[in-house]
């Protein structure tokens, strides 16, 4: 017995160093491992977490590792200057740290649109030395460079490489969604003419995109085409994790209704606005058999109207128009339960609610259109001149959000109380283009100021300045300036234009409202298609209409230019 106990004791003593080493190795793995292990893994925390780790680091190597992790995350948080500042602090690095730093530097260059620099940095990286996580980051930078160059196919090829390296389901889904977004927005000619050349995954993606493009105008057929694609490509990554925005197609039902409620202010202060929108709605309805029941929101509270709508068995609603009434719906979402609702305005409180979409002639649409137009025109340092009021703040915010998406930097926003204020913002501004929101008389003063400054800056304006009262002298003064407005104004010789011009006495503001009413009828008749079919759009009088975030109907504006005393359409 004693012999057995002694043998057990000796065995335990011999095993203790081994067990201790094994335990420590397990702890190292659990706590994140050494520097190389940390850098070779995903950085799932925010930058503040890693900066705190920097201050807790026991030695310089560990400190550098956490600075690299913080810099990596700062780039994804779009905090480029902070990331660069951290990298500049790094001095003596290990080989593993130098390798990881090179990926971060390439990522920063790609975000800053320095594509040649980013490309060169990637080419100097030895792929054999990268972990799966680092390889995924490498190809993510490659995809970003390709996107910067508008090369959707090369970006997709990089995304396919990323998919093979990811194991986390949520990250795989995000990568598939990004891949699909690239293809859906790609030029159709590029999609149709690209050959997969043995790349099975690319071939599947191209087939899915072609099926989508060919059937987009007929969502019922599109749903069938998607099902057929899944049958033909059962092992494709997108067959396992289908693009999120396409998943609703499997339950798609075409828009159908026999009754619709129209909610407008038809008395009181907003009577003219309500009646003009109704006239456009009625004209677009024309001889349709659909029954329209009209409710005056100035005479009856909106919550009462919605109860009446439900009691009448109506399941489709257009309106209300006034912001306070839209906000009331948002605060009492149960009112719209069981209904398809297209409001005729949006508010700052807007959010996604089941069967509800927002439509209106918002300044945000024009601001986003202006940012897109200026970017396409090669403008890289824009200034935005807007009035110091709610309209100006909304316009500036929308323009800047879109500009950040396009250029990864802020636009130069300037608010004014009087047109003369613009003088003080011109002196030291190295701007290549100016977007101006102003009434026509204010715009005339602003343009004169800019012209007199001797600057050769491209000028853009919102529809706010486009008025029927603008005389020939005004149009000559505006020579070269481009402005956005609804496409309805493209053909001023059409019978439809002349009819609406007569009805509204040539008031452009009322003509826009009439066009809005006509498009409200168009939109409600394509309600399910807009909500469920990504990329679905219809050509309306107020723009090319599609559903964006929160089912906010977005309008792609038409651009015009003053030329030799006249106005020409640029679209």
UniProtKB/Swiss-Prot annotation:
Lipidation residue positions, type N-palmitoyl cysteine: 27
User: What PANTHER family does the record tag this protein with?
Assistant: PENICILLIN-BINDING PROTEIN ACTIVATOR LPOA
Q: Could you give the subunit structure recorded for this chain?
A: Interacts with PBP1a.
Q: Which residues bear S-diacylglycerol cysteine-type lipidation?
A: 27
Q: Where are the transmembrane segments?
A: none
Origin species: Pasteurella multocida (strain Pm70)
Q: What does this protein do?
A: Regulator of peptidoglycan synthesis that is essential for the function of penicillin-binding protein 1A (PBP1a).
Biological process GO annotation list? peptidoglycan biosynthetic process; regulation of cell shape
GO CC terms of this entry: periplasmic side of cell outer membrane
What domain of life does the native source organism fall in? Answer: Bacteria
Q: What is its main location?
A: membrane
* Entry protein name: Penicillin-binding protein activator LpoA
Q: Which GO terms describe its molecular function?
A: enzyme regulator activity
């Amino acid at each position: 017995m004693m012999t057995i106990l002694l043998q057990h004791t000796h065995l335990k003593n011999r095993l203790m160093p081994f067990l201790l080493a094994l335990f420590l190795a397990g702890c190292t793995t659990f706590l994140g491992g050494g520097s190389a292990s940390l850098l070779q893994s995903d950085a799932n925390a925010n930058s503040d977490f890693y900066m705190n780790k920097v201050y807790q680091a026991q030695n310089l190597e560990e400190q550098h590792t956490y600075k690299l992790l913080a810099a990596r995350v700062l780039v994804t948080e779009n905090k480029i200057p902070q990331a660069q500042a951290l990298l500049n602090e790094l001095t003596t690095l290990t080989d593993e740290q130098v390798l990881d730093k090179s990926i971060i530097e390439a990522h920063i260059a790609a975000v800053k649109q320095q594509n040649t620099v980013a490309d060169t940095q990637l080419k100097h990286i030895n792929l054999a030395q990268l972990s799966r996580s680092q390889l995924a980051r490498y190809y993510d930078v490659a995809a970003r460079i390709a996107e910067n160059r508008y090369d959707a196919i090369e970006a997709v090829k990089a995304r396919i490489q990323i998919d093979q390296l990811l194991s986390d389901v949520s990250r795989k889904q995000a990568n598939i969604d990004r891949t699909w977004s690239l293809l859906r927005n790609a030029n159709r000619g590029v999609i149709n003419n690209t050959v997969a050349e043995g790349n099975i995954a690319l071939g599947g993606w191209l087939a899915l995109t072609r099926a989508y493009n060919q059937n987009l105008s007929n969502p019922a057929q599109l749903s069938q085409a998607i099902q057929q694609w899944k049958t033909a490509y059962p092992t494709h990554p997108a067959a396992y994790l289908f693009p999120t925005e396409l998943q609703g197609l499997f339950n798609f039902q075409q828009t159908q209704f026999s009754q619709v409620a129209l909610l407008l202010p038809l008395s009181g202060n907003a009577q003219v606005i309500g009646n003009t929108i109704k006239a456009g709605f009625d004209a677009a309805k024309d001889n349709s058999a659909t029954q329209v029941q009209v409710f005056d929101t100035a005479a009856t509270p909106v919550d009462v109207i919605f109860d009446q709508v439900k009691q009448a068995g109506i399941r489709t609603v257009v309106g209300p128009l006034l912001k306070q009434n839209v906000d009331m719906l948002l605060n009492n979402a149960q009112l719209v339960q069981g209904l398809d609702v297209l409001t005729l305005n949006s508010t700052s409180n807007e959010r996604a609610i089941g069967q509800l979409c927002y439509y209106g002639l918002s300044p945000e649409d024009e601001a986003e259109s202006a940012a897109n137009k200026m970017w396409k025109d090669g403008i890289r340092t824009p200034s935005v001149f807007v009035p110091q009021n709610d309209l100006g703040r909304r316009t500036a915010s929308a323009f800047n959000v879109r500009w950040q998406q396009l250029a990864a930097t802020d636009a130069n926003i300037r608010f004014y109380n009087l047109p003369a204020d613009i003088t003080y913002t011109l002196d030291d501004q190295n701007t290549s283009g100016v977007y101006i929101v102003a009434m026509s008389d204010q715009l005339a003063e602003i343009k004169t100021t800019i012209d007199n400054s001797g600057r050769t800056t491209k000028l853009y304006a919102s529809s706010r300045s486009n008025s029927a009262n603008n005389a020939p002298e005004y149009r000559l003064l505006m020579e070269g300036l481009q402005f956005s407005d609804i496409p309805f104004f493209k053909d001023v010789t059409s019978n439809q234009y002349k009819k609406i011009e007569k009805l509204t006495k040539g008031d452009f503001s009322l003509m826009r409202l009439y066009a809005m009413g006509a498009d409200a009828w168009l939109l409600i008749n394509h309600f399910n298609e807009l909500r469920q079919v990504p990329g679905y759009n219809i050509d309306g009088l107020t723009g090319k209409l599609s559903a964006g975030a929160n089912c906010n109907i977005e309008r792609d504006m038409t651009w015009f230019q003053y030329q030799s005393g006249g106005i020409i359409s640029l679209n």
